[in-house]
């Protein structure tokens, strides 16, 4: 899934996402934006991209930490596809067909989503 890839993580990214990336043999780095030797950039901030000619940026949205791969072509058109659906704690399963990893949410989160009071 992420094998042989290098990623840049900023301070907004949860440690679970970094650990997940590393579990799939990806290399993690904390570097200033503009550094060119990484394949993916992770940030919680929406629409925050690394300004490089060819890059793939992953954006994380709280509370589910949904990450989307954004591929930028030479024609400047944007193509988005899901890469990681990151909930809170334990790994649930990996779907290699759509290159997605799902992490299990906390039980209290599930109850809240079902309309129950915490």
From Swiss-Prot:
Q: Does the keyword Cell division apply?
A: yes
Q: Which GO BP terms, alphabetically?
A: cell division; meiotic attachment of telomeric heterochromatin to spindle pole body; meiotic telomere clustering
Indicate the principal place this protein occupies in or around the cell: cytoplasm
The residue stretches assigned to a coiled coil in this entry are none
Report quaternary structure and partners: Interacts with bqt1. The bqt1-bqt2-sad1 complex binds rap1.
Tell me, in a sentence or two, what this protein's role is. Answer: Involved in chromosome segregation. During meiotic prophase, connects telomeres to the spindle pole body by forming a bridge between the telomere protein rap1 and the spindle pole body protein sad1.
Q: Can you name this protein?
A: Telomere bouquet protein 2
Organism (species): Schizosaccharomyces pombe (strain 972 / ATCC 24843) (Fission yeast)
């Amino acid at each position: 899934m992420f094998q042989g890839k290098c990623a840049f993580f900023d301070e907004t990214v949860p440690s679970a996402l970094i650990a997940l990336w590393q579990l799939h043999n990806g290399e993690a780095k904390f570097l200033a934006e503009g550094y060119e030797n990484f394949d993916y950039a992770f940030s919680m901030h929406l629409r925050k991209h690394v300004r490089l000619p060819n890059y793939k940026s992953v954006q994380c949205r709280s509370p589910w930490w949904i990450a989307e791969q954004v591929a930028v072509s030479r024609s400047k058109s944007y193509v988005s596809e899901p890469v990681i659906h990151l909930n809170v704690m334990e790994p649930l399963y990996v779907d290699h067909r759509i290159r997605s990893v799902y992490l299990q949410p906390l039980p209290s989160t599930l109850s809240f989503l079902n309309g129950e009071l915490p």
